[in-house]
Design a protein with these regions (language model features):
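Canonical positions in the second alpha-helix
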Residues: 66, 99-101, 135
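Bacterial signal peptide processing site
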Residues: 26-29
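C-terminal motif of bacterial Sec signal peptides marking the signal peptidase cleavage site
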Residues: 21-24
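Short, conserved micro-motifs composed of acidic
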Residues: 35, 41-42, 86, 90, ...
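Alpha-helical segment of the N-proximal tetratricopeptide repeat
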Residues: 36-69
Length: 430
């Protein structure tokens, strides 16, 4: 699939909706009895716990309740804005960042940057450019040089967006439908042949009640859907050999020979930080074997390691590409490790600064036929937050990443792009 020649051939791309922002943080079926009787300080503790563990939908529900009693609390307002942002409700995030920026910019200088960013992510590109420029001139923090680089990148992204929107690609984007898209969120689609799709789903749209906070368990699980007569079935859970109880499980992919299945398990560490690790399950004679956690070379202790994709290499060996927040070029980077015929993983190496930026690179997918790596980044100039990019090569030798264009990329986050095996289409999350 070559997006530089996409205007000559029609591609059908199916989209799974990452719908956190559309469900709204203020609703979730929680009754007054469940949330009533708590002081605003206790609600704040609950909200902070959910935020720290990455459950932003639940966090913004409780932050909203705190602000009903403490409407002038800018610290909580900023946390609410962050929760809205991370749950993809960019309109509400924009309004709350603006409130903080207007009332206490000195204490929260980054609220100006996030205000500009959410203008961009709601498609208001001329306004966003203006606010980014203002922020770049006024910001005096210790990381001013870093923020100036980000501002320059975001302004380039706004310019690219205005150009790309006027030159849409010959692409049809199709919503996957309610059989797969749940009310809350889907992630990490992985086609298996022409008629199967493995994906992760958060099958819940309810806010966690106070009495359930201490026993909070992972809710992401891996599902498989089958297509019959052009209609996808309701997703069925993969077996417990993969979906370990009490874990958030996602980001599944097969090795090129379909004998191994790699995926991610996430849980909170002792400090409450969500840490993800990569696991592998052998798939033999149609049955799943008990999964094993990859060794410390891949799962570096104290860091998140996630989003695996596996490519072919020379003489029967393979390459694991994955994402980690271990020290590298910036925030989350894409790394690779060679896998020997005996299944031994070599020390991981960073893909390099041509791919990895000062910001984050996520959700890589390597196409073994075309040798194209697709990934999402918020560090290369883009239309929205995370855009999908493509680059040809392997290991540390890559062409300059290209933005795959509109309408695959939009003003919001577009991630988890994966091509069909016949390269006539693909799937992604938006």
């Amino acid at each position: 699939m070559n997006f530089t020649r996409i205007h000559t051939s029609l591609l059908i791309l199916a989209v799974l909706v990452l719908a956190l922002g559309f469900t709204g943080c203020k609703s979730g079926g929680m009754s007054a009895q469940e949330g009533g009787g708590l002081s605003w300080k206790n609600k704040l503790k609950i909200a902070d716990k959910f935020y720290k563990e990455g459950y932003f939908y639940d966090a913004c529900h409780y932050y909203s309740e705190v602000l009903e009693e403490q409407p002038d609390n800018m610290d909580v307002t900023y946390k609410l804005a962050e929760s809205y942002y991370l749950s993809r409700d960019y309109k509400e995030a924009n309004e709350n960042y603006k409130m903080v920026m207007d009332k206490n910019l000195v204490l929260y200088p980054m609220s100006h940057y996030k205000y500009a960013l959410t203008l961009k992510m709601t498609g208001r590109y001329p306004e966003a450019k203006e606010e980014f420029a203002k922020f770049g001139k006024s910001y005096k923090g210790a990381d001013a040089n870093l923020q100036k680089k980000r501002v320059k990148n975001e302004i380039l992204g706004c310019d690219y967006a205005l150009e790309a929107l006027g030159k849409p690609l010959n692409v049809v984007v199709i919503h996957m439908g309610n059989e797969i898209n749940a009310a809350y969120t889907e992630a990490s689609p992985m086609p298996v042949g022409a008629d199967k799709l493995i994906y992760a789903s958060l099958r819940s749209d309810t806010v966690i009640a106070f009495e359930d906070v201490k026993s909070r368990v992972g809710r992401f699980q891996l599902y498989q859907s089958v297509k019959t007569y052009n209609r996808w079935s309701q997703g069925e859970l993969l077996p417990p050999e993969v979906n370990e109880p009490g874990m958030d499980v996602a980001n599944g992919c097969y090795s090129p020979d379909k004998k191994r299945f790699f995926y991610t398990q996430c849980k909170s560490d002792k400090t409450g930080k969500m840490i993800c690790s990569i696991f592998m399950s052998d798939f033999i004679d149609g049955k799943w074997k008990k999964a094993k956690k990859l060794d410390d070379k891949i799962n570096m202790e104290g860091y998140t390691n996630t989003h695996p994709t596996v490519g072919k290499y020379k003489k029967g060996t393979q390459i694991l590409y994955f994402v980690s927040d271990r020290p590298g070029a910036g925030g989350k980077d894409i790394w690779y490790s060679e896998i020997s015929k005996d299944g031994v993983f070599k020390d991981p190496k960073n893909l390099g600064k041509k791919i990895n930026t000062i910001s984050d690179e996520l959700t890589p997918f390597y196409n073994n036929e075309s040798r194209v790596l697709y990934f999402s980044s918020n560090g290369h100039p883009g239309i929205g937050g995370y855009d999908v990019f493509s680059t040809e090569g392997r290991l540390r030798k890559w062409t300059k990443p290209e933005n795959v264009g509109y309408p695959l990329n939009s003003s919001v986050d577009d991630m988890y792009f994966v091509a069909d095996e016949d390269e006539t289409g693909g799937y992604f999350i938006s």
